[in-house]
């Protein structure tokens, strides 16, 4: 169910804008329609009240917990079953946050990510995205939503922006606490500044070397890291929210001295935060995360060079809950494989035009 369809159905049942807002706020908050000041029967039209039990049943069925995997850090990985039987992952974060998925699978094909191995299976609707937040709120308070789960939000832009608008206007979540993550897609830089709700931004950078980035993110738009940073900086200055750069640390690949110099050159003095995230290793690819001492050293040295760098724990490492791992295990689709080699430097990367030609319906 898409969010415009949900709003239309409410109108068809006699809901005026004030009635629809009341219903949507109750759903997103996971609270009953009645409150201490006003009962639903004194406010909502009878036809709408009669239709709501069936509608709420549909909304509950959009996303249900298939399995839950608590982590020692206070996080919990949820394998979420959708109404058609497909599954995605959500993560309850330690401090009142949730990480949600935007697609079943992913077309970007990052070589260190389990999600992209099966490719893109389908888009999530805006209602399915919001339903993950509702599910999280049934377990703990949620004041922050990060769109960093399975999928590339830029490839499902209309539905993701619909979800962001609902969460920001009716869901009680501050705009800067809605974090849109992307590998870097020009459509995002064009659309987000025009949105009513302007979320914070996270950019998956992972390297300052353009050729290496093509190999790590083989189907991402081929935008030079320098240009990505310039685009990110412009958005940060416009919204007043610092850009978050995501950097999955891979031992011997992007934890080198050359990368340290590259990060300092690109980000020193920028309105930005560099999140260094040691890789969540799996048996299926053979990549390794560097030692914690090496990761901490990188963060310290970047601080000294004028880069606000934070060393992050990847939520769920102790339960092997990296992006796509729970789903792969549930599908029995994670055989032990030899390490996948990086594509050779000669392998042609997907051009922005080629990436745009792939169909990503809204």
Swiss-Prot record:
One of its GO terms (biological process) is rRNA base methylation. Residues 342-362 are annotated as: Disordered. InterPro entries: Aldolase_TIM, Methyltransferase_A, rRNA_lsu_MTrfase_RlmN/Cfr, rSAM. Transmembrane segments: none annotated. The keyword GTP-binding does not apply. GO terms for molecular function: 4 iron, 4 sulfur cluster binding; metal ion binding; RNA methyltransferase activity. [4Fe-4S] cluster binds at residues 106, 110, 113. Residues 343-362 have a biased composition (Low complexity). The keyword Iron applies. Keywords: 4Fe-4S, Cytoplasm, Disulfide bond, Iron, Iron-sulfur, Metal-binding, Methyltransferase, S-adenosyl-L-methionine, Transferase. Disulfide bonds join 99-323. NCBIfam families: PRK14464.1. This is Probable RNA methyltransferase Tbd_1951.
